[in-house]
């Protein structure tokens, strides 16, 4: 089993797809990486030679921030926005949507479950 950036790549998948299991690498970056390292995208992970794995590992480490480093950077950026008090930081702090979505309805995932409001009752039929 090939191991790149701390992730075990699935043996049965094509290399182009398997690389997307690494956080920070999608289909586009996967294709770019394979082109730069001269690895055939249709090769299965189990068929990769040790030399190809080393080339892929070196290329990814040299050119991309992935996995833990990328996660740390994202968290640091969010923390910095919260500290300087910009609009996005305030939205993060209040656990509301950050990218301009509506909140009058929807946004339940970000806001959490509904909370009952004391004193408000539905009008009954007479």
From Swiss-Prot:
Which InterPro entries does this UniProt record tie to the protein?
A: Rbsml_uS13_C, Ribosomal_uS13, Ribosomal_uS13-like_H2TH, Ribosomal_uS13_bac-type, Ribosomal_uS13_CS
**UniProt xrefs under PROSITE patterns:** RIBOSOMAL_S13_1 (PS00646), RIBOSOMAL_S13_2 (PS50159)
Q: Which GO terms describe its biological process?
A: translation
SUPFAM superfamilies reported for this sequence:
S13-like H2TH domain
What are the GO MF terms of this UniProt record?
rRNA binding; structural constituent of ribosome; tRNA binding
Q: Give the UniProt keywords, A-Z.
A: Ribonucleoprotein, Ribosomal protein, RNA-binding, rRNA-binding, tRNA-binding
GO cellular component terms, semicolon-separated: cytosol; small ribosomal subunit
- Which residue intervals make up region (Disordered)? 95-126
One Pfam family linked to the record:
Ribosomal_S13
Q: Which domain of life is it from?
A: Bacteria
Q: Which NCBIfam families match?
A: uS13_bact
Q: Which PANTHER family match?
A: 30S RIBOSOMAL PROTEIN S13/40S RIBOSOMAL PROTEIN S18, SMALL RIBOSOMAL SUBUNIT PROTEIN US13M
Q: How does it assemble?
A: Part of the 30S ribosomal subunit. Forms a loose heterodimer with protein S19. Forms two bridges to the 50S subunit in the 70S ribosome.
Q: Which family does it belong to?
A: Belongs to the universal ribosomal protein uS13 family.
Q: What does this protein do?
A: Located at the top of the head of the 30S subunit, it contacts several helices of the 16S rRNA. In the 70S ribosome it contacts the 23S rRNA (bridge B1a) and protein L5 of the 50S subunit (bridge B1b), connecting the 2 subunits; these bridges are implicated in subunit movement. Contacts the tRNAs in the A and P-sites.
Listed name of the protein: Small ribosomal subunit protein uS13
Tell me the organism. Frankia casuarinae (strain DSM 45818 / CECT 9043 / HFP020203 / CcI3)
Q: What is the lineage of its organism?
A: Bacteria, Bacillati, Actinomycetota, Actinomycetes, Frankiales
Please name the gene that encodes this protein.
rpsM
